[in-house]
Amino acid sequence: MGAEILFYPTAIGWATDQDEETNKDQYNAWQTIQRSHAVANGVPVVSVNRVGFEQNGAMKFWGGSFVTNGQGKLLYLASHDKEEIEVVELDLNESDYFRKHWPFLRDRRIETYAPITKRFIDED
């Protein structure tokens, strides 16, 4: 069967002197890629991120931990500025449904993957 839930523990943030627009763009990109793991694999994703500041104050961690279902739907989103503990109930039977009705990875062409293991595609 494989994994039933994907967990991504992280400690990602930004320099405190970085502009707010860039900060938001980076957080949104991180959330998008994490949610895409749920879609690609058809299983819930739990992305946990550190919150607060590094001891020297030079880095602020995003917080914003979240949980999705197997289609990447946001089920829970934590605060960006305080520690939280949340229990989120997940229906693991949904994963079978998502995998059967939208088999995202079924149609991949793994026979075409070999070239990415080479530094240069024309290398023999």
Positions of the model-derived regions?
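CN hydrolase (nitrilase-like) catalytic-core segments centered on the catalytic cysteine
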Residues: 1-85
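A structural signal for well-ordered alpha-helical scaffolds and beta->alpha junctions
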Residues: 27-31, 91, 117
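Cysteine/selenocysteine-centered motifs that mediate thiol-based redox chemistry or coordinate metal-sulfur cofactors
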Residues: 95-124
